[in-house]
Regions:
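Domain-level signal for soluble alpha/beta catalytic cores
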Residues: 1-372
């Protein structure tokens, strides 16, 4: 167990397609037809089956597939004291699709005591063995800050927190509490999921904030500072990684653009062990920004797409790995899909079998490049 530290040569980002049993049970719970305990029993059963599949696939990380969540990010945010669940009159906009309308509203001092995800983690941890370690995924602190200022949310946030620095400090402290509680529960692998950096890469967003008189570098540095504040004092044996995302809803995307605008900030200065980076299509740009990754940090190349069932050509993927090697040594590189398979309940447009075929391909390529 002591030698298992994320990331792994063949890896995955966290979420899996929701089984129909989960979808049905959640719908029945929402309609008041079953109790919370009955829903939890279904979730436990389906998560157990998922972990069995992860182990059979040879994965060294195990997760709950985010089966207990509606969204990859909001459910975690709703677990903080001082954060309320709300519905907006619209969702997030992707290419040709709109998500459901969930969001958050700050209602008091933000804190992280008794976060429900700690219990979620404990359920997964019981399945650890000498070949696998339980991993907890969560939205990055910067993602919470971005949601608090998403469109009209910012007016309420500023009313509750007129001192912006206090807001940053409270968010960071809340995360430190959750990280501490997870660590005390035995967690040694945490993954931040962070779409803010993918957003910063997008020319449309860059133009939007420029019109508002905001400098991209200033906003990026604030988000970096917040993430690092949340990581202060983390134990040396706790692996913490960041997945940078450009949106992944029902096989669509939200932002585009290479990593050049953020690389000198994020890659050089975020206090994590590794970055999971999307590189599955031209929206992600080239590998040149990898030159900014700080010494000792690893990069997990997201070269296999979860947005399509089509299996990538092995030789082409291997060639791209060696192309990335021009900027970062091969022993600091790993391979994974570019994102999860279901960032929310709806999931991407592929079947359960196609999902596992993708992960099988990741493993086969990794073993060919780095050995078994």
């Amino acid at each position: 167990m002591a030698t298992l530290r994320s990331p792994f040569r063949y890896d995955f980002v966290g979420s899996f397609l929701r089984p129909q049993a989960i979808k049905t049970a959640r719908a029945e719970f929402k309609a008041g037809e079953i109790t919370r305990e009955q829903l939890t029993a279904v979730e436990n059963e389906q998560i157990t089956l998922l972990i069995e599949k992860q182990k059979r696939a040879g994965d060294h990380a195990i997760t709950d597939g985010e089966f207990r969540r509606s969204y990859w990010h909001l459910d975690f945010m709703w677990g903080f004291a001082g954060i309320d669940e709300i519905e907006l009159d619209h969702g997030y906009y992707f290419q040709g699709e709109e998500t459901t309308h969930g969001s958050i509203r700050v209602s008091g001092k933000i804190s992280g005591e008794n976060h429900p995800f700690v219990e979620h983690y404990k359920f997964v941890k019981q399945f650890e063995d000498e070949n696998c370690i339980a991993r907890q995924t969560m939205p990055a602190p910067a993602q919470l800050l971005a949601e608090l200022y998403r469109e009209d949310n910012g007016k309420n946030t500023d009313a509750v927190y007129p001192d912006h620095e206090q807001l940053l400090q409270d968010i960071a402290a809340a995360y430190r509490t959750v990280i501490r509680d997870l660590y005390n529960a035995g967690c040694r692998s945490i993954q931040f999921d962070d779409c803010t950096w993918g957003m910063f890469c997008d020319p449309n967003y860059q133009a939007f904030i420029a019109q508002a008189g905001v400098k991209l570098e200033d906003q990026a540095n604030e988000y970096l500072r917040l993430n690092n504040l949340a990581l202060e004092g983390r134990p040396a044996d706790l692996a913490l990684t960041t997945h940078v995302c450009r949106g992944n809803y029902h096989s669509t995307w939200a932002s585009r653009g290479g990593y050049a605008p953020i690389a000198p900030i994020l890659f050089a200065h975020e206090n994590v062990d590794a970055f999971y980076l999307e590189f599955d299509d031209e929206r992600s740009g080239n590998f040149e920004p990898l030159q900014y990754v700080a010494e000792g940090k690893k990069v997990v190349l997201g070269l296999i797409t979860t947005k399509s069932p089509r299996l990538e050509d092995k030789a082409a993927v291997i060639a791209r790995i060696h192309e990335a090697e021009k900027y970062i040594p091969l022993d600091r590189l790993c391979l994974s899909p570019q994102c999860g398979f279901a960032s929310c309940e709806i999931g991407n447009k592929l079947t359960d079998l196609e999902q596992w075929n993708k992960l099988k391909l990741v493993k086969e390529i990794a073993e060919e490049v780095w050995g078994k």
